[in-house]
Amino acid sequence: MDDKITIDRIKEAHPRLRDKMLQDYRGANSRLGNGVRLRFAYVFRSNSLQDKLYNQKPKVTNAKGGQSIHNYGLAFDIVLLYDNDNNGTFEEASYSQIKDFDKDTIADWKEVTDYFKSQGWECGADWKKFIDPPHFQYDYGFDWKTLKARVDKGIIITENGITYPKI
């Protein structure tokens, strides 16, 4: 079952990536058992929100506004939701990488991560400098500097009130 908050956040993803992101969200979510649901905690982030996160303590990002793939709608961060009392409310949000709520002997986080990686998503868990397990991105081979330069030069599309680089 889809998480409405996640579906709304996917609508803010880069238009070129939106359909893939939705399809892969549903594919990953379908691998989770009853009582577990995948949520995207972030998809698109404005530069001002990015700066706020950058200045937060403890440190949660190395990227200032404009320096994150999130700022271009090409990334998402995940969190797993658990319905501990089986009433459909999913009262626990978790970043646990070991919990196996559906008792299939594979950690729920691993099931989701393995699926996204199999679909071509880069995972922040594999980074060497700033390891970021909840982060996934599909950047079409562009780094943030190139994406920012496109926006700065007006090579853009605007949709839903959000400006994205043309890619």
PLM regions with names:
Residues M1-D143, L147, N160-G161, K166:
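Cell-envelope/glycan interface and biosynthesis
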